From Swiss-Prot:
Disulfide bonds: none annotated. The gene is arnF. Pathway: Bacterial outer membrane biogenesis; lipopolysaccharide biosynthesis. Residues 1-2, 57-76, 122-128 are cytoplasmic. This is Probable 4-amino-4-deoxy-L-arabinose-phosphoundecaprenol flippase subunit ArnF.
Length: 128
């Protein structure tokens, strides 16, 4: 069950990251503080997406807490790297994100996935 909570946490955190990225690219920069605050107070689509991203992170932390009760930290922590993979793929697939494909990034994703497979492979107990 810990693995399932961990996967929920990763998926929710990835969606939250994409939401925050969308909001950050559409809201005024925080260097223009009054414009930023005015946009938040207007509670338009961008501000609502920012709020959803923040709430998503909060929900992800709850799932992560449940994960740590059921799964060893060494395995649970490795799951977090899947978020990089999901956000990278989503940025290339979703319209308007303009994510770029590169062999270097693909190699990095392959390394992450290989590492996860090594960590989560079932171990066989040797009999002597």
């Amino acid at each position: 069950m810990g693995l399932i909570w961990g996967l929920f946490s990763v998926i929710i955190a990835s969606v939250a990251q994409l939401s925050l990225g969308f909001a950050a690219s559409h809201l005024p920069p925080m260097t223009h503080l009054w414009d930023f605050i005015a946009a938040l107070l207007a509670f338009g689509l961008d501000a609502r997406i920012l709020l959803l991203g923040l709430l998503g992170y909060l929900l992800s932390v709850f799932c992560w807490y449940k994960t740590l009760h059921k799964l060893a930290l060494s395995k649970a922590y490795a799951l977090l790297s899947m978020s990089y993979v999901l956000v990278w793929i989503a940025s290339m697939v979703l319209p308007g994100w303009e994510g770029t494909f590169s062999l270097k990034a693909l190699l990095g994703v392959a390394c992450i996935m290989s590492g996860l497979m090594l960590i989560f492979l079932p171990t066989t107990k040797q009999r002597y």
